[in-house]
């Protein structure tokens, strides 16, 4: 497989789906390009019009195996034959414990370790904020300009990437201070290291 463009971009099928999306979906995401995914294989993504692209996004953060990796597909199929969903808050599940134990063994920190599973990075940020407040008694946070943490209210309060993401949601959680990264290659204050 290799990249191949078969239609003008976006193609006719993609344009129809994008138009339908704009009518039916909440405009809560900023999509940078008019791509409508049909399927993927490894590093390639094919749109609904048959155009093949080299996918430099390949999912968010945790899907670094590429699209449709055979081992991942097999694991999903095996699990789907048992059950599709369970809540770790309602009952226990052996595989969940095994994954938690493996993470605890491999996390390079000393002392007592425990795992908290979430559905998303935003939920992980919310949990981290709650843990920080609970264990320190403090309620202020430092976050970086240009950093993205999620779209839930707490995570959005820390997010410093796109102002449009916060539009209509003020006031956000108080006590968040945004600062620049401590890297002056492109210093926002036009300063240099001594």
Annotate the PLM regions:
Residues 101-194:
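PLP-dependent aspartate aminotransferase-fold enzymes
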Residues 46, 65-66, 157-159:
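Short beta-strand-to-turn element immediately C-terminal to the catalytic PLP-Schiff-base lysine
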Residues 34-56:
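Active-site and channel-lining beta-strand-loop segments
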Residues 6, 46, 180:
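Residues in well-ordered beta-strands of folded domains
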Residues 20, 24, 79-83, 172:
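Structured helix-beta-strand junction loops
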Residues 4-7, 52-142:
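Glycine-rich loop-to-alpha-helix module at the N-terminal edge of alpha/beta enzyme cores
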Residues 1-41, 91, 96:
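Active-site-adjacent loop/helix segments that line or gate small-molecule/cofactor pockets in enzymes
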